[in-house]
Amino acid sequence: MSTTKKDDYYHVGLTDDEVLQSREKNGINLLTPPKRPSLWKLYLEKFEDPVVRVLLVAAVFSLIISIIENEYAETIGIIAAILLATGIGFFFEYDASKKFDLLNAVNEETLVKVIRNGRVQEIPRKDIVVGDIVILETGEEIPADGELLEAISLQVNESNLTGEPVINKTTVEADFDEEATYASNLVMRGTTVVDGHGTMRVLHVGDATEIGKVARQSTEDNLEPTPLNIQLTKLANLIGKIGFTVAGLAFLIFFVKDVLLFFDFGSLNGWHEWLPVFERTLKYFMMAVTLIVVAVPEGLPMSVTLSLALNMRRMLSTNNLVRKMHACETMGAITVICTDKTGTLTQNLMQVHEPNFYGIKNGSVLSDDDISTLIAEGISANSTAFLEEAATGEKPKGVGNPTEVALLLWLNKQGKNYLELREKAQILDQLTFSTERKFMATLVDSPLIGKKILYIKGAPEIVLGKCKEVVLDGRRVDAVEYRSTVEAQLLGYQNMAMRTLGFAFKIVGENEPNDCTELVSANDLNFLGVVAISDPIRPDVPAAVAKCQSAGIGIKIVTGDTPGTATEIARQIGLWNPETDTERNRITGVAFAELSDEEALDRVMDLKIMSRARPTDKQRLVQLLQQKGAVVAVTGDGTNDAPALNHAQVGLSMGTGTSVAKEASDITLLDDSFNSIGTAVMWGRSLYKNIQRFIVFQLTINFVALLIVLLGSVIGTELPLTVTQMLWVNLIMDTFAALALASIPPSETVMLEKPRRSTDFIISKAMQSNILGVGSIFLIVLLGMIYYFDHSTEGMDIHNLTIFFTFFVMLQFWNLFNARVFGTTDSAFKGLSKSYGMELIVLAILAGQFLIVQFGGAVFRTEPLNWQTWLLIIGVSSTVLWVGELIRLVQRIIHKKNRNEK
């Protein structure tokens, strides 16, 4: 802490004792970080997956049988599946969390000037207490909530809290802005002083500040289930019902046939005569449990987790830092995006859109003529902003009022050195901008003409009203006569949501006073022209908005800006159509708050713009949209966005956003690009389709395996597939398949579809037909093999069982190629040469099956096959692929014919 000499401040500030008392009573100036779940709790959360829960039930039943039979391979396999699925999910979320913490690091040691014991001191921001007198200067972040004691031309950037980039602050009650979100004499932690200076008395610190309250709201638990979780719950329930129903029926049939009707219970005496009854009952009970275990797709939770994890990593390469794994897929289900304006749709960077100086030839390009030189000196001297020195190749940045920075940047592009012009022009008097005057004036001793010049800039209508003449190219006209022309220009700019400034000058005689106020009041200035300044939309936003709209996603702008500005931005990005949209499609935050829930529910889906919105308005909008069945994503970079970011199904923060916003989000857009949202939607939709493809592949296996075990037991043959063989098919091979299907790159075509409904079951009718159709064909072929082997000379010996097992695996192997293009008419070989992951996985499955057959022995109940048998199995089983190719070829021909007819 550093202390300066005693200054002539009339504020004494707190004493050391008062500081300690205030800190003890009101706490320190730190925001409580969101409570992080312990690693153990984070891991246990993975067990909330519905399919994992079904696996847990299966593991319990399997363990019972393992204890009875003293054979634990099945149980170990199921437990391994559970641990792998949960472990992978845990690792990737923990890894993302660590990356996020590094991204989101904040420094609470920033020094702040305060008055204590009558002296100006610099202390760390975290040491500020309620009652402290804080000195506010241009460019500084306000460290706590406070009440202004002094405000000299004070302007504050509240865009990260209210969405408003520049707010005028004052202690004069008559000048308060009644429409402002916060009173004009209050300043809030996290906002920035962009112009002027002042002092404030701290009212709230830490969590009691507005930003602290928003941070708390943003970390409240949001138990809204994800769309994928809802679908997997339905699937788990279906699988559980089918498994338990089939197992129950099988047990009942065998128990009645081979126990109730077989034994004469009246003649049984003693426990030794009842023993065969118990043994046979236990045998059929174990068969029932085996059916349940076979019905459960052990590879499904791992495949979903792998798909999410792979997409999590790959989305990072497209500037989407995914913090919560479920957000990868949920992005594909969103139906509404609620977006902030400032910094999300716009660049949050004021820039000169159109200079219109009437005295130079084309009005927008400065040259070396006298008027251009006057304009350059006026902009340079009549300003309090600065440009920071930029590194080679980088654009210069400014410090101070964003509007003045925009003017200096424009001057810089014109090849004028503002600093050199400012230093040469000796300032004699200056009136800083104020809301009362609505202009700024500076009197300089100009080296350009060796005379005094008064420069003025401000609200065009005010500046023009103080002018006698308007400077045109080569002539001057009466200001009153030219007013209508200027007003027409201003109206055009205002309709485009632009800020406008008027510029004027006056050459001051030697005998005239060096008093700006007196000189301006003479109303004999020369009007130079107007400049339109905009916060431009991001170049990629209109295309990104169109992309989302074509994908059936509704977009709603929620901003603290005025209705006019918000509407114009909406028009520029293609969201607002003046010919078709009405007042029903836009509303202010105040009007929205006055609506009852019933009235608001009636309007939320139609709304496109909410202006003058407060954090609570945005949060309520999200919750009402969810009540209407919408899947909502919220974008934002400010602290004001945090509650809505947290309560939405997917919160999307900007990489340059506030720490509170990023903490509340699920995905951080590292490049701050709205376009990345469209990319994330494409990834999410493609991921969902890849999961559906895996389900088609997986459930076909389970459907066939379930009926093979059931019918095999009915026929009375030896179990055609062993536990270890099913583990290879259901766990290891499925993991390879999951990797293959998850690595399919996203397709742009998914953005031409409408969002899926949250009520739609993950297994579509097309999937059902494929699973039942293909599965039935596989079943008939495999039952035919069982019948053939049963009636052959060798019977179902190890050799024939090995052939059966290998043929079963190869059927699934070739079906993997069909699953890869399920839902399309593409050939299974399309893009295969570029898909190195798929090629490696195909080789891994073939190599794994070869090693199991040739060297598995008693563990896998196999014996080596000769190369002729291998070729025969591969050739015959590949019919699955060729039939699929033929069907897709016919579909392509039909589609092409239909397109030509249209």
Residue ranges and their predicted role:
Residues M733, A737, F778-L779, T802-F817:
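Generic alpha-helical transmembrane segments
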Residues K765, S769:
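HAD-like small-molecule phosphatases
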Residues M1-P755, D760-I763, S776, D790-H791, ...:
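Conserved cytosolic headpiece of P-type ATPases
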Residues N770-M785, M810-L811:
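Alpha-helical transmembrane segments of multi-pass integral membrane proteins
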Residues D797-L801:
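Transmembrane alpha-helix entry/boundary detector in multi-pass membrane proteins
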Residues Y787, S792-M796:
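Long hydrophobic segments that form regular secondary structure
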